[in-house]
Amino acid sequence: MGILGGRRANKAGKKGMGVVARLLGLGLLLGLAWAQILPPEGGLYVYSDGTVQALEAVEGGYRLAYRRDGKVFREDRLRFGAEGIYLEGVALPEGFFPFVPPLLLYPKRLVPGAFWSGNARFQEQRVALAVRVEGVEGVRVPAGRFNAYRLRVAFTTERGGADVKLLYFVPGLGVVAFQAGEGLVGLVRFSAP
């Protein structure tokens, strides 16, 4: 489930990839040009797969809680940095797991052709994230029509897991759609606090 939770290129990395993909993947669902990457005040996102994400503005960044069936199953810790928004770590029922160093999720500014990548230690393994802005594309979702940046996100682990996803990102709002298996999960509703 989520941005990075689709097809795997290597079944050998399936176990390590599943947890890491779910953790990192949903973190990539929200995003903006720095002061406009995400809504400054936060907000509530409802997606067509039933996932609800609550983005809360906190000092120096955001907390992003993921709920399904009314229960929080994960919380991402995001912070502002010199280059954009970084994923510091993920809180799960079993504890908090940091990315060392934090991974750049979204740079201050998106432009077609832009590329960024990073490596980190996460849950006792090395992980790598690479993102390319493929262009701007019109996308229709239950929440409306948007001109969104199409991002290709590649995620790999040292245990052989690999995943590639597409997501559709609108600066100032966040991710309005993302690939899940063969289909597209769309934003149904966004509400500001």
Question: Can you describe what each PLM-predicted range is?
Answer:
Residues 101-104:
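Short alpha-helix capping/helix-loop boundary micro-motifs
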Residues 1:
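Extracellular attachment/recognition segments
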Residues 23-32:
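Bacterial N-terminal signal peptides
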Residues 34-85, 90-91, 97-98, 108-193:
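Acidic, serine/threonine-rich low-complexity disordered tracts
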Residues 13-24:
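Bacterial N-terminal signal peptides that target proteins for export
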